[in-house]
Amino acid sequence: IFSVANNELGQPKDTANNIQASGEFVVNMVTEELFNAMNISAADFPAEVGELEAAGLHAAPSVRIKTPRVTEAHVSLECTLFSTQQLGANTLFVGEVVMFHVADHLVGPRLHINNFSPIGRLGSPSVYCRTTDRFDIARISYAQWKQSN
């Protein structure tokens, strides 16, 4: 799930138009080393200017969909479009993940989450967060919950 705001002229951005036309998209997880390139790629480029090239990034072919992914991303999710919802000047896209791409250094018997620190956008045009303040908590079982209530 993610949303795309309209451009400064109130028109849908290329990203929204491309998703609507193709019925698919890729979510590339952004880490600190990719943040500046991501910020460049978010500019309102004209349709004839490639954001990836402008940001110094590279495209890699996807496996299950035609839309390429970002080579430099440590995690990419290939998605088919499930639904859209217009929310004012934003379009909310809900997709079904059909393929995961995860960098080798993050893979083992379990995902090595401590080696991965994606950045999240919280809203507004410029508010982001880091995912470095983490903690573990054991999941309670139903039997434990029932015993304590």
Where are these predicted regions, by residue range?
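Basic, polyanion-binding surface patches
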Residues: I1-N149
